[in-house]
Amino acid sequence: MKRKKQYEKEFAYWFEKLNDICGDKQKESIEKDILCDIYVSCEKAWEYNLQRLNNRKIKYLLIGEAAPWVKSEGVSYFYQTFDNSGEDIQPITWIRGLWNVFCSSQPPKNSERKIDIQESLNILANHNFLLVDSLPFALKSDEYKALKRKTKNGKSKYEELVCACSDFLERKLKNTKIQWSKIPKIAFAFKRNGEAVIKAHRAGIRLPSGQLLKFNYNQIAATGNGFPSKKSLCKGWSCGNSRNRNNCSGSMDRRQKSL
């Protein structure tokens, strides 16, 4: 209960920034209570995933936008569901692409069985992978589209929002529970979001270890359909043809099985 109150307090802080940037018309469509519930649920899952890393040094960082908006079907967040395409359905395209950067086998079909979801996430952790969102708001797609429209000065409210919430991403990456490889590889999942994050962090992000995470436009891995693919991720991460992939079956170790 104490942790939940902390998350709700954090959300109120971020929501105030959103409120300051949105116009009155946009404010009317934003459902604060649902956004708060999604935020709390995602933060719990994020903390759990930090335990999963278990001193592994992050080599592959993927920066995303935010957890998807949901209202009636439960929170659909990467670190809770892995994939939200439905039980026994092939995972959505970008998750297949991500999986195949590291694994020669196909990713498991989605399942409601939590053990399958956790095993998939454990396998990615074994490959020193971390996904971090840059915004704390699971807004509806049309709400984000409205924010992304350019204003008269050539900027957008979306860029203002990413800049105003730049501490959200910075706090995530500076978490002392995360250990980093000597030269982490960075990719952005989405074009507009990546561009806004790069502008908001022109000097990069200095980690507690003294390492500097530097961002550039070559790291944007979004393809023509708006999502990253295996090829674009390999390009963003400068990882060649991923020749060191394995079939990823039975990749959990004993430490992860106990989580």
Residue ranges of predicted features:
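Extended, charge-rich low-complexity interaction segments
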Residues: R245-L259
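Short, flexible loop segments at boundaries between secondary-structure elements
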Residues: I92-P107, G204-N247
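Detector for methionine-enriched segments
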Residues: M1, T223-N225, M252
